[in-house]
């Protein structure tokens, strides 16, 4: 008999690094979730841009079950068919010639930064170890990646931090140019800063970074953990910009909810990595790669990407209508189905309150700092779910603005 659990048990049993919502989801289908009490939610949070095809997609369940009935794991002393097939799909769909599989975005970024340093050390010299990243970025929670992320609140308690990492202002080419020099081995950047406020890079900024990296023999790393796998209306966001990185990291939506990450690069850069220089126990796990292969099959189609662009327009239109009514947002921005509503000054710091009211109204949204409400719904969310979810979001906005009784 299963143990009966409640939200209060989290506070009793779990390390307190999260503050989960007061409800516990127990079942999902498409873009809808139901909690222990049977209440329905429209899911515009998407597991933080993970559930690209919603919950319990039948094709993903089939791929997982089929592989689960074969075998689950062997470790990196052996390869497997699903991993090789997924690698080939990623290579065929991108600039990449080599793939490294891992379990998360943080691990993918850790691998990318290690590769960049090793390439510079082997090909140029040990002096070339500098990494340039950007303020308000987020690249993961390992000590290396949290140091590269330009948010001191995430790293300040863990000193001493890895050295030779400097941070420029995002979308400011002059700021980046002042830091990138011949001692720089890598520049790591998000095409859209997700945790930093859903801020898309300008084309001129990314093109300028590409030119600076070429000039100083530094590798350009695109962190596409949040923007990748169709989220922006292209398979990867770099395709919007006409700027090709040397290394790309991907995770989140790649597994559609099953943990997986990957680092993509070229044969030349990958060649400095030899057996033992890096590794992972679970990376390339056949369960994860079987599911991810099916995710790519579904998402990497013109129909899906056109659908993301159409759904983007539907969200923007309805969010603008909500804003005309309530005047709460100074800007609505983003690419594809990664969107952020920036709060007006009078509502500054209240993004979390809006998210809480939204949940009471029956819609799940995210935040990106205290001033931005973030949306990362499934890429196949229906028109009806968009309409219903944003009607519920409007109710939450009304409740917050008027100070009325809580929703629900």
From Swiss-Prot:
Reaction equation(s) it catalyzes: N(2)-succinyl-L-ornithine + 2-oxoglutarate = N-succinyl-L-glutamate 5-semialdehyde + L-glutamate
Record-linked CDD domains: OAT_like
Pfam families: Aminotran_3
Pathways involved: Amino-acid degradation; L-arginine degradation via AST pathway; L-glutamate and succinate from L-arginine: step 3/5
Cofactor: pyridoxal 5'-phosphate
Modified residues (N6-(pyridoxal phosphate)lysine): 252
Keyword entries, A-Z: Aminotransferase, Arginine metabolism, Pyridoxal phosphate, Transferase
Protein origin, superkingdom: Bacteria
PROSITE patterns: AA_TRANSFER_CLASS_3
Family designation: Belongs to the class-III pyridoxal-phosphate-dependent aminotransferase family. AstC subfamily.
Role description: Catalyzes the transamination of N(2)-succinylornithine and alpha-ketoglutarate into N(2)-succinylglutamate semialdehyde and glutamate. Can also act as an acetylornithine aminotransferase.
Protein name per Swiss-Prot or TrEMBL: Succinylornithine transaminase
């Amino acid at each position: 008999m299963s143990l009966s659990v409640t939200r209060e048990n989290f506070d009793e049993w779990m390390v307190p690094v999260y503050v989960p919502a007061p409800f516990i989801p127990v079942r999902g289908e498409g873009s809808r979730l139901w909690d222990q009490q049977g209440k329905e939610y429209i899911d515009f949070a998407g597991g933080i841009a993970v559930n690209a095809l919603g919950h319990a997609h039948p094709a993903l369940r089939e791929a997982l079950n089929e592989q689960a009935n074969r075998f689950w794991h062997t470790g990196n002393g052996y390869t497997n068919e699903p991993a090789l097939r997924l690698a080939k799909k990623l290579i065929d769909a991108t600039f990449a010639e080599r793939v490294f599989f891992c379990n998360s975005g943080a691990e993918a970024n850790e691998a990318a930064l290690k590769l960049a340093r090793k390439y510079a050390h082997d090909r140029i010299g040990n002096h070339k170890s500098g990494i340039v990243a950007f303020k308000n970025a987020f690249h993961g929670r390992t000590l290396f990646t949290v140091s590269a992320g330009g948010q001191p609140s995430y790293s300040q308690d863990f000193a001493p931090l890895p050295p030779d990492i400097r941070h420029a202002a995002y979308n400011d080419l002059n700021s980046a140019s002042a830091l990138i020099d011949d001692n720089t081995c890598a520049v790591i950047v998000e095409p859209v800063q997700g945790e930093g406020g859903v801020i898309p890079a300008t084309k001129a900024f990314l093109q300028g970074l590409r030119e600076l990296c070429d000039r100083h023999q530094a590798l350009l790393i695109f962190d596409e953990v949040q923007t990748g796998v169709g989220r922006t209306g292209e398979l990867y966001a770099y395709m919007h910009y006409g700027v090709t990185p040397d290394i790309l990291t991907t995770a989140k939506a790649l597994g559609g909810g099953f943990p997986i990450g990957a680092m993509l690069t070229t044969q030349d850069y990958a060649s400095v990595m030899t057996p033992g220089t890096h590794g992972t126990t679970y990376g390339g796990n056949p369960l994860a790669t079987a599911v991810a292969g099916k995710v790519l099959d579904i998402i990497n189609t013109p129909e899906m990407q056109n659908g993301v662009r159409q759904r983007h327009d539907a969200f923007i239109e309805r969010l603008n209508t909500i804003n005309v009514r309530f005047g709460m947002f100074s800007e609505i921005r983003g690419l594809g189905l990664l969107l952020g509503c920036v709060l007006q000054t009078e509502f500054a710091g209240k993004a979390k309150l809006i998210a809480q009211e939204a949940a009471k109204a029956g819609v799940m949204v995210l935040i990106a700092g205290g001033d931005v409400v973030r949306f990362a719904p499934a890429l196949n969310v229906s028109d009806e779910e968009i309409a219903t979810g944003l009607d519920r979001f409007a109710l939450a906005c009304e409740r917050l603005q008027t100070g009325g009784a809580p929703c629900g």
